[in-house]
């Protein structure tokens, strides 16, 4: 008879744990769905603007040299 009560206690513990986990997970999912259902104007304020990409322009080298590996190198004829 003891074995049945042990199994019942284990089953109740597992069910209680899963119920608490569902209570914690479901509200966050509902919040995400309700956030998606907002109009785009309301959500655009939450978005972080993307940084503009800076084009890396190599510096101008003096005549007779070329820009090689991030520095100006003199080309010997």
From Swiss-Prot:
Disulfide bonds join 61-72. Its main location: secreted. InterPro entries: Secapin (IPR020128). It is found in: Secreted. The keyword Disulfide bond applies. Residues 1-32 form the signal peptide. Keywords: Disulfide bond, Secreted, Signal. The keyword Hydrolase does not apply. Residues 33-52 form a propeptide. It holds the Pfam family Secapin. It comes from the Eukaryota. GO terms for cellular component: extracellular region. Belongs to the secapin family. Nontoxic peptide. This is Secapin. It comes from Vespa magnifica (Hornet). The lineage of its organism: Eukaryota, Metazoa, Ecdysozoa, Arthropoda, Hexapoda.
